[in-house]
Amino acid sequence: MKRVSIELLEREASTKGDKKSKRKEGLVPVEIYGKGVQNIHAYMRIKDLAAMPHGTTFLIEAKLGNEVLPCLLKDIQYGWLGDNPVHVDLYNISNVTETDVEVPLEFVGTPKGVELGGTLEIHLHSIELKVDPRNIPEKITVDISNVDLGGVLHVKDLNIPANCRLMEDPEEVVLVVAEPEETKEGEEEQAQEAATK
């Protein structure tokens, strides 16, 4: 799993005006909470937040004073325009042995069915797993090159690491390679003709 190191700045109880002033300085308020630990109020640099990986799971090593806290990114709240972070929640995993996480799926290869004119329809882009937070997989790689026309890939078909517990319905559909419309129409016409004979 990827690790990202950030440095936090201590934050005393502050007013709305104080927080607004800090945002102008390139800082965003952070709340750190977790099992059996005291909540911590801090600030982090917005540029550090922007530099964090996207589309993968990662561990944050948050340095506050002389202490380094292992954390997961739980939530980012944005302003009404949707592009300005106004608050960040980090989950301190120091005392956690298992946690639920969303792990992204990475699809590799071109399905056989797509090469034959089918359409790839992806229903799930991530799955929920229960795992030791220190061993969270960055992603689950899924080879879809053998999925044929009309083929369906279910959650149970995924290669889940042995140290993870699946929290999804095994029968849930991950993706489908739909047949071309003309093929469907032709099959329907044949069925209608057969029914009238």
Curated annotation (Swiss-Prot):
| Disulfide bonds listed in the record | none
Which PANTHER family does the annotation name? RIBOSOMAL PROTEIN L25/GLN-TRNA SYNTHETASE, ANTI-CODON-BINDING DOMAIN-CONTAINING PROTEIN, RIBOSOMAL PROTEIN L25_GLN-TRNA SYNTHETASE, ANTI-CODON-BINDING DOMAIN-CONTAINING PROTEIN
Assembly and oligomerization: Part of the 50S ribosomal subunit; part of the 5S rRNA/L5/L18/L25 subcomplex. Contacts the 5S rRNA. Binds to the 5S rRNA independently of L5 and L18.
Q: What does this protein do?
A: This is one of the proteins that binds to the 5S RNA in the ribosome where it forms part of the central protuberance.
Keyword Ribonucleoprotein (UniProt): yes
Keyword Ribonucleoprotein part of the UniProt annotation: yes
The record's annotation in CDD domains points to: Ribosomal_L25_TL5_CTC
Q: Which SUPFAM superfamilies match?
A: Ribosomal protein L25-like
**Lineage start:** Bacteria, Pseudomonadati, Aquificota, Aquificia, Aquificales
What biological processes does GO assign it?
Answer: translation
Q: Which GO terms describe its cellular component?
A: cytosolic large ribosomal subunit
Query: InterPro entries of this UniProt entry?
Result: Rbsml_bL25/Gln-tRNA_synth_N (IPR020056), Ribosomal_bL25/Gln-tRNA_synth (IPR011035), Ribosomal_bL25_b-dom (IPR020057), Ribosomal_bL25_C (IPR037121), Ribosomal_bL25_long (IPR001021), Ribosomal_L25_dom (IPR029751), Ribosomal_uL5_bac-type (IPR020930)
Q: Which organism is it from?
A: Hydrogenobaculum sp. (strain Y04AAS1)
The family line of this record is:
Belongs to the bacterial ribosomal protein bL25 family. CTC subfamily.
Task: State any single GO MF term.
Answer: 5S rRNA binding
Highest taxon listed in the record's lineage: Bacteria
Protein name stated in the entry:
Large ribosomal subunit protein bL25
Q: Which keywords appear in this protein's UniProt record, sorted alphabetically?
A: Ribonucleoprotein, Ribosomal protein, RNA-binding, rRNA-binding
